C-alpha cells in the first residue's frame, strides 16, 4: 500500500478523524448492513469495463469491489489504514486487483482529471471541510466524467442518529458543517455547482432487518460505530449524560423499528464534470 502523508496543516484533524474511525468495528457495520449500497451506486453511475474509478473514503470496499467486478480499473482511497486493510482482504478473497491509497479526501494525492468516475458511499460526508472535499472530487475527475455520491439524508434514521450523537462528539472541528447536509439535494448540488452539469438526485432506502428490539439497535452502534464510541467516551464520567444519550438513541431506534425491520433513507447524487 502506498501511504500518503497529509501536510502539516491537515495532520492534526486528519489524525483525530482517522483514530475515530478506527474505534469499534465500522468494517463490520459496512459489510453486515451497508454492503447493498455499493452496487447501487456503481449501477447508478453506469460504471463500465475499463473505466478508471476512484472510490473516495472507500472504507472496507463496498463501492470499490463491485466496481472492480464490473471490470473497472479501481483505486480505493481512505484515511483509515485499518479499513483499507479490510478492503484489501475482501478484494483478495474475491480474486480482484485494485489500487490502494491512504489519503485524505480534502487533499487527494492524484492528478487533475486522472479518473473517469469519482464515487463515494457514506464516506466523504464525514470529511470536516465540505467545499474543499467537493472541490477535490471534481479536480481529479476528467471533463465529461461522472461524480457520484450516496449519503444519509438528514430526515432518515441514520441522519437523525448522527444528529443525536453530534453534541457529544469532542473531536469535531469547531464550526464543522453537519455531515448529513450531504444528504440534502440543494446542499450537495451547491457544493458542486461550479464544477458540474447534468445534476441528478434521487432518494432511496436501505432495508435493515438486523435488530430485534430498540435496545439491541442502540447497543450495536454503541459498541461498533466509531462516532458513537467517541461520543460515549466523552461522557463516560457522567452517568447522567450516558443515561440521557442511551435514552435518546433507544427512542430513535424504536421510532424506526417496525416488526424487526428498519428503513434507512439515503440520497444519491450524480453529475457530469464540466
UniProtKB/Swiss-Prot annotation:
SUPFAM superfamilies: S-adenosyl-L-methionine-dependent methyltransferases (SSF53335). Residues 1-30 form the signal peptide. InterPro entries: Methyltransf_25, SAM-dependent_MTases_sf. Keywords: Signal. CDD domains: AdoMet_MTases. One of its GO terms (molecular function) is methyltransferase activity. To M.tuberculosis Rv1405c. This is Uncharacterized protein Mb1438c.
Amino acid at each position: 500500500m502506498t501511504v500518503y502523508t497529509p501536510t502539516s496543516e491537515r495532520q492534526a484533524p486528519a489524525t483525530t478523524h482517522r483514530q475515530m474511525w478506527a474505534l469499534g468495528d465500522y468494517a463490520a457495520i459496512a459489510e453486515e448492513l451497508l454492503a447493498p449500497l455499493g452496487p447501487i451506486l456503481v449501477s447508478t453511475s453506469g460504471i463500465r469495463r475499463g473505466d478508471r474509478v476512484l472510490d473516495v473514503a472507500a472504507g472496507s470496499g463496498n463501492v470499490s469491489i463491485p466496481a472492480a467486478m464490473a471490470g473497472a480499473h479501481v483505486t480505493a482511497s481512505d484515511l483509515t489504514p485499518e479499513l483499507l486493510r479490510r478492503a484489501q482482504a475482501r478484494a483478495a478473497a474475491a480474486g480482484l486487483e485494485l489500487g490502494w491509497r491512504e489519503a485524505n479526501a480534502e487533499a487527494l494525492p492524484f492528478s487533475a482529471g486522472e479518473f473517469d468516475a469519482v464515487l463515494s458511499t457514506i464516506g466523504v460526508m464525514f470529511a470536516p471541510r465540505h467545499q474543499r472535499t467537493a472541490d477535490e472530487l471534481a479536480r481529479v475527475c476528467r471533463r465529461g466524467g461522472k461524480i457520484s455520491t450516496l449519503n444519509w439524508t438528514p430526515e432518515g434514521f441514520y441522519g437523525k442518529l448522527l444528529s443525536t450523537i453530534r453534541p457529544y462528539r469532542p473531536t469535531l472541528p469547531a464550526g464543522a458543517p453537519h455531515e448529513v447536509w450531504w444528504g440534502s439535494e440543494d446542499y450537495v448540488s451547491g457544493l458542486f455547482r461550479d464544477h458540474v452539469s447534468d445534476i441528478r438526485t434521487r432518494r432511496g432506502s436501505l432495508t435493515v432487518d438486523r435488530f430485534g428490539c430498540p435496545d439491541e439497535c442502540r447497543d450495536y452502534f454503541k459498541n461498533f460505530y466509531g462516532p458513537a464510541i467517541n461520543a460515549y467516551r466523552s461522557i463516560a464520567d457522567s452517568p447522567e449524560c450516558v443515561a440521557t444519550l442511551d435514552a435518546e438513541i433507544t427512542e430513535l431506534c424504536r421510532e424506526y423499528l417496525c416488526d424487526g425491520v428498519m428503513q434507512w433513507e439515503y440520497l444519491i447524487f450524480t453529475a457530469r464534470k464540466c
